Amino acid sequence: MPESITPIAAAAPASRALLADGAEQVFWETASTTEFETPVDREMFQWRYFGYYLEREPELLFVATEGDTVLGYICGVADTRAHRELYEVAPHVAVFDDLYDRYPAHLHINLTAASRGRGLGGRLVASLESAVAARGAGGMHLVTSPGARNVRFY
């Protein structure tokens, strides 16, 4: 069965809940941090990198599926500065504030290990790029680190 990419906000309510659950499962499967001092720390980590986008910008959360299986997702915002709450929950957001005139949009993307290397990540990025461009974003940024497994992808 071929892969499909669905904006979560466009899915029927029952499907949307299943897609959100599947995307959150991918989030935890691929998370760079898996151990937390407290349950609140774990919740904040999830909120910072996934839950915020699901709640605040569902139109910019795209889920890749094959049949009923969620393979990955991409989420983001078209204008980082318009999301002031991110400055509070993710302090690193303020570090790059001087770049947001040129690159206002940002993203988070995660794919299961089995779905990498098939072009799906590029298709997810293209979906989000089109959506943020339609909202007037002239550029998109992301943050990673030199040793991260995603460097080669970007």
Placement of each model-derived feature along the sequence:
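Conserved GNAT acetyl-CoA-binding A-motif
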Residues: 103-105, 109, 132-145
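Conserved active-site alpha-helix within GNAT-family acetyltransferase domains
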Residues: 107, 118, 122, 134, ...
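Glycine-rich acetyl-CoA-binding "A-motif" of GNAT/NAT acetyltransferases
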Residues: 69-72, 149
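Active-site rim helix/loop that mediates acceptor-substrate recognition in acyltransferases
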Residues: 37-61, 66-67, 75
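Conserved N-terminal entry element of GNAT/NAT acetyltransferase domains
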Residues: 1-18, 29
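Hydrophobic alpha-helical core bundles mediating ligand binding, dimerization, or RNAP-core interactions
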Residues: 20-31, 45-49
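Conserved acyl-donor/pantetheine-binding loop and adjacent beta-alpha core of acyl/acetyltransferases
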Residues: 75-109
